Amino acid sequence: MEAYAMHKMAIVAPRKARMTLDLIRGKSVKDARAILNNTNTKSSRLILKVLNSATANAVNNLNLKEEELFVSECFINPGPVLKRIKFGSRTKVDRRDKRTSHITVKVSDGKEA
């Protein structure tokens, strides 16, 4: 059975967060937590929260054992871009794009329903 969790509108660039997400794909939940705890990036902290939420959903809602869970699927979709302005010298104005992401993590025990 499979449980999932999502974090929408996370203010982190999808391209940067995908590099962290590739580290945990297919790993057990215990190993994925260890990897994310030792990775010093903003995206790893956000992904760890989503992983903990997906694990709690599996344990509490589906009565699965935490020791048997692994990360079956995880992906990041780009969210809306927040457009901001940056003032430069000599009255120049540039546009800064703050990219957002939608993070999804699915955990499974490998058994069908």
Where are the regions a protein language model picked out?
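A short, conserved strand-capping beta-turn/loop at the end of a beta strand
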Residues: F75-G88
